[in-house]
């Protein structure tokens, strides 16, 4: 049984009205009848251009937004059918790393509080135990305890993304959606973050849905690759096959348009 299974997933948004109350007819199918599976321990790379629906899929898989139709199963449980309490318990096992490492961190909070927030919510315990867990998490992402009393604006973009990764790891999740986690970083820093994610996967047995517009980034990290175009899944297969023998013309154009990534 796959860890994550998506069946016939669709997300439809109505077209908005203008200031005169006109328009609003029709709809946009951000995700259109998508089915895919993610096996435990693998990285499924979800790649496509801006507006392809890939980030919407990431949010649907975590049920951060509701689907228009279709199902999302995690360890055999249909998330769409779960009540708030059951879903809250499953949140421990499913986390997200956001694209913007600054916007995703509350600027009013110190690093210690940011990383500890999931522990406060899901694992009430002593402050001493939480602080030790936060130290452990920071070490895991290549930072030290000198970061604890500092605020997000005091760090570089790469360091902020490491803090976001530490927070995502706090509850020892099985599955992480990494939504364009290096697109806001320069190439060298982004490569360091990709290497960190690969290392954490090896050490912790994580499963990733890695979302990116960059085929070279996805090619480096992914076990399998799924290609999105205008809300539809146009090609899925092993990473080596997709990157060397693509069948779909859009996949071919993505490969031709992007340079190699040095990691």
Regions inferred by a protein language model and the residue ranges of each:
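Conserved ABC transporter NBD signature motif
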Residues: 70-78
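Conserved ABC ATPase "signature" region
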Residues: 77-78, 128-146, 255-256
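Conserved ABC ATPase signature
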Residues: 151-155, 159
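ABC ATPase NBD coupling module
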Residues: 20-25, 79-95, 113, 121, ...
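A short, proline-enriched helix->beta-strand linker immediately N-terminal to the Walker B motif
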Residues: 170-174
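Helix-to-loop junction immediately C-terminal to a conserved catalytic motif
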Residues: 62
């Amino acid at each position: 049984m796959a860890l994550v299974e998506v069946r016939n997933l669709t997300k439809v948004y109505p077209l908005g009205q203008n200031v005169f109350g006109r328009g609003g007819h029709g709809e946009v199918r951000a995700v259109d009848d998508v089915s895919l599976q993610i096996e435990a321990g693998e990285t499924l790379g979800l790649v496509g251009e801006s507006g392809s629906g890939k980030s919407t899929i990431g949010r649907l898989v975590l049920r951060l937004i509701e689907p228009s139709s279709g199902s999302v199963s995690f360890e055999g449980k249909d998330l769409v059918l779960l009540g708030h309490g059951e879903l809250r318990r499953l949140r421990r096992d499913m986390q997200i790393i956001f694209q913007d490492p600054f916007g995703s961190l509350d600027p009013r909070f110190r690093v210690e509080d940011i990383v500890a927030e999931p522990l406060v919510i899901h694992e009430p315990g002593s402050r001493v135990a939480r602080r030790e867990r936060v130290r452990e998490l920071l070490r895991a992402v290549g930072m030290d305890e000198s970061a604890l009393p500092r605020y997000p604006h005091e760090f570089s973009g790469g360091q902020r993304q490491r803090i976001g990764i530490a927070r995502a790891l706090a509850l020892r999740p099985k599955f992480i959606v990494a939504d364009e986690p290096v697109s806001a970083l320069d190439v060298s820093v982004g490569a360091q973050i990709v290497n960190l994610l690969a290392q954490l996967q090896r050490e912790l047995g994580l499963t990733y849905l890695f979302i990116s517009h960059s085929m070279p980034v996805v090619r480096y990290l992914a076990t399998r690759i799924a290609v999105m175009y205008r809300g539809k899944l146009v090609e899925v297969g092993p990473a080596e096959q997709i990157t060397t023998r693509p069948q779909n013309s859009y996949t071919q154009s993505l490969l031709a348009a992007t340079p190699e990534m040095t990691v």
